[in-house]
Design a protein with these regions (language model features):
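A short glycine-rich, His/Asp/Glu-containing loop-to-beta-strand
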Residues: 2-33
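Short acidic (Asp/Glu) patches
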Residues: 10-12, 29-45, 110
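Extended recognition/assembly regions associated with phosphoester-bond processing machinery
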Residues: 16, 23, 98-111, 134-154
Length: 154
């Protein structure tokens, strides 16, 4: 399956089973060698991760400010934060190489921002508890760009 062109026709493919409910989301990801899954979060969610096959580099961060850690703001404020591309402070919590059968547990405030880079064609399975809620910012995925302290201009 690791070289099956059906599963790796794009850089990042996924199969999602969410049954239109807010309780959970099951996702199978296929990530092609050399592809980076961008830095993202799972706000107010826990995620159980298992690498089915392949090899991934993994980096995770913890948000520092309690307000951002739990998306503790109203919808208008959330949209303003996104449109202004407000910087948030996060500290690196983990960096590791993952191999077949490795598991991770992402909690709402620990390792919640993370990214993967595929060292070879890989497949992993996520169980997200609860499911994302696109209409409510408290459980809506957000993508980030890492900026090092020495790159920040006032």
């Amino acid at each position: 399956m690791g070289d099956d062109p059906y599963y790796f026709k794009g850089n990042l493919n996924r199969v999602t089973v969410d049954m239109d409910n807010e309780d959970y989301r099951l996702v199978l990801f296929f990530i092609k060698k050399g592809t980076r899954m961008p830095l993202h979060d799972h706000p107010n969610m826990s995620v159980f991760f298992r690498l089915i096959f392949g090899s991934l580099d993994y980096r995770s961060y913890d948000k520092v400010d309690e307000k951002f850690k739990y998306n503790n703001f109203v919808d208008d404020e959330y949209h303003e934060i996104l449109s202004s591309k407000k910087r948030i402070l996060a500290k690196k919590s983990r960096a590791m190489s993952l191999k077949t059968d490795d598991v991770l547990f992402v909690r709402p405030s620990v390792n919640n921002m993370h990214e993967f880079v595929a060292k070879e064609n890989s497949c992993f399975f996520d169980v997200c508890l609860p499911n994302y809620t696109p209409t409510n910012h408290s459980r809506r995925i957000t993508y980030f760009k890492e900026i090092m302290k020495d790159q920040i201009t006032q």
